[in-house]
A protein has these predicted regions:
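Non-catalytic, topology-defining segments of multipass membrane proteins
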Residues: 1-203, 248-332, 336-348
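Active-site-proximal inter-transmembrane loops
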Residues: 150-158, 212-238, 243-245
Length: 348
């Protein structure tokens, strides 16, 4: 396989005042959790470690990677509603915000990937892409109206709206259960250590997944495929594959590209808990999956919802969601429709 050369992109200019303005709602919490994660190392037991790793898979694999990312953001597959809600609760316990916030940020990332407006592009620095955008930045300071523009589907779901408002509740309940079962030691490992590992696993996809690795597809961003990022993120490290074909539930497109979340989705299909699965495979140039809304190859998004929930049926969910009735937004929407998007070419 020939590796496609990464794009040479100019840095995104982030307002320096914004970069220096600490998010006091987030920074102290992250500091506390990192202190707790370090403290857990002094109270090590194998039982506590295995509990932490199991919860890491439940919250990071089933929750973030499979539910927040592939199910809610990209609608790569569907599940019964009760199971979708269960997976969402698992994701919320990862301490990465409620479903409306997480999905809105990720859809915006795909809309502006490595361009002005991307919440966490490494074009403004590796640290910014990893955690700087969380500790400072404006990505987590989104009002309800802004969120609804990016997630009109989730905004109509009362459960997702409620869970976004009370997203700390599942973590509090989990902590209480762990304390009742195994005392403070189990809380240190099952809450603090597990959460910190999960946070950095997510952040490293945003940073390393756009810096180091190989590029099978010539996408118009800097996304890369990275095997070790894929291992810690349950398959999301095949990031160039994902940016080439966002609607695909399968990120590891080759047999040797380990994608644990894809294996889980396949198992769920066998037991009747997953259906309408979009399985992207390299075939010279990628084509939109059956049922996908007409869009550019880079932002294809299959929506099970009526087109009336979208601002424009001709654009992807996270592309058209930023439009409103203002003249400037209408001009931007027309420009997006006319934008020249050459076919993706797979490098073998």
């Amino acid at each position: 396989m020939t590796v496609a050369a990464p794009l040479r992109l100019t840095p995104v200019q982030i307002d320096q005042h914004t970069k220096k303005r600490l998010n006091w709602e987030v920074a102290p919490v992250l500091f506390l959790f990192h202190v707790g994660a370090v403290a857990a190392l002094f109270f090590f037991t194998w039982n506590a470690f295995f509990v932490a790793m199991f919860l890491y898979w439940v919250t990071g694999g089933l929750g973030l990677g499979m539910c927040y990312h592939r199910l809610l953001t990209h609608r790569s597959f569907t599940t019964p509603k009760w199971f979708e809600y269960f997976l969402t609760i698992c994701a919320v316990a990862a301490l990465e915000g409620g479903p409306l916030l997480w999905v809105a940020i990720h859809r915006k990332h795909h809309q502006y990937s490595d361009k002005e407006g991307d919440p966490h592009s490494p074009r403004d620095g590796k640290w910014w892409a990893h955690a700087g955008w969380v500790l400072t930045g404006n990505a987590l300071r989104q009002d309800v109206a802004t969120l609804k523009r990016y997630v009109p589907d989730l905004a109509e779901d009362k459960f997702h709206v409620w869970l976004t408002k009370y997203h700390l509740l599942p973590m509090a309940i989990l902590g209480a259960v762990l304390f009742a079962v195994g005392g403070f030691r189990l809380v240190l490992w099952g809450v603090f250590f597990r959460t910190v590992v999960g946070l950095h696993a997510t952040w490293i996809v945003n940073s390393a997944g756009h810096i180091w690795g190989s590029r099978r597809f010539q996408t118009r961003d800097t996304s890369t495929n990275n095997w070790w990022v894929a291992l810690v993120s349950f398959g999301d490290g095949w990031h160039n594959n994902h940016h080439a074909y966002p609607v695909s539930a399968r990120h590891g497109l080759k047999w040797y590209e380990i994608d644990l979340n894809w294996y889980t989705i396949w198992i769920l299909k066998q037991v009747g808990l997953a259906s309408r699965i979009h399985d992207g495979r390299p075939a010279g140039s990628l084509r939109p999956a059956p049922g996908a809304l007409p869009s550019t190859p880079l932002v294809s998004f299959a929506s099970p919802y009526p087109e009336k929930t979208l601002h424009s049926a001709s654009l992807a969910h996270y592309t058209c969601a930023d439009s409103d009735d203002s003249p400037s937004s209408q001009r931007r929407a027309r420009d997006l429709r006319k934008e020249d998007c050459p076919p993706l070419r797979a490098r073998r």
